[in-house]
């Protein structure tokens, strides 16, 4: 038995899909445990680029299972479209498994998501308007519709009628929008459910059986620790728990079955949407990194905010997720910069602090304390080992390890799988 959790250590978009795809070569099961189609991941496979929102990267290997766990909120329409997208590109998705306990996103969730965000005016949190938050709200309120409910025609009809009666009161009276009609939703979404039915099962049983039989399971998180609803920059967060602890709840697997946790990070920092970002760059260096790395959201297409590497963020992420290894991406993006800054701590009203504050007011007052390191000009995109890196690039990686307190197991010098280089071969234990 062996299991590894892949967790984003910043604000998402760290390249989790790339390292998950890399690690999945040695996995038997690849499982996603939270989030929805609000976060995309980009995977390059056999020379083709795939942009997926819901389906785990294990889908590309027919000798592996790709699992969508119970902690995911599932838009049936999006998933059916994603399955067709894969088929159109020559990928057979028959190795997909979907939890019968996963909650379903319906049109009223999307309508409410947009209306609620619009009503917040200056207090917007940067939602993707995919209905994720309202779906998780229904789950917590115990009125959500699960995949198991979607598959039963009578059950789905009864629950949809009940929920629409309540949601339309909010949609029409609070937000002054047109009500949604039962007949505009029921037939289409029941049909989506029937299309997905062959993939639906109790995924907790699937995963635990695999582990009990000595197979390797890779758990794939969406977003990142700093977007975690409990540990992130609340309220500028997602509605679920991307931290490693989310695996046990979102997959139906006990904590004793989790072996290692890989924190994925960029060689710098990026963020989409509003919220605190102490090391954010507003100059030509930020523009250079954004354009060099094509830093635009996979789903939203929004330009990402760019900043220097922040070790305060990484230490926080390490602490709350228990990283055993780091996987660093985009090292090549920094090539050409004369000087590279690394945030070692914050100055909070004259006091040096090393831990990430919970208070937004304190975060606004925090000023990053930087250490400057010399950059490099050499092309590193063809590098295959740590030793082949320029000395300054080696020193940069060692500095990050020192500041975070976790060793880097892999580093990437480009988007292709072949550009992922391994330092520590014992991620699987």
UniProtKB/Swiss-Prot annotation:
GO cellular component, one term: cytoplasm
Annotated GTP binding sites: 12-18, 40-42, 304, 330-332, 412-414
Top-level taxonomic group: Bacteria
Binding site for Mg(2+): 13, 40
Biological or metabolic pathway of the protein: Purine metabolism; AMP biosynthesis via de novo pathway; AMP from IMP: step 1/2
Top EC class of this enzyme: ligase
Entry GO MF terms: adenylosuccinate synthase activity; GTP binding; magnesium ion binding
Keywords, sorted A to Z: Cytoplasm, GTP-binding, Ligase, Magnesium, Metal-binding, Nucleotide-binding, Purine biosynthesis
Needed co-factor(s): Mg(2+)
Catalytically driven reaction(s): IMP + L-aspartate + GTP = N(6)-(1,2-dicarboxyethyl)-AMP + GDP + phosphate + 2 H(+)
Family: Belongs to the adenylosuccinate synthetase family.
Subunit structure: Homodimer.
Name assigned to this protein: Adenylosuccinate synthetase
Protein's organism: Lactiplantibacillus plantarum (strain ATCC BAA-793 / NCIMB 8826 / WCFS1)
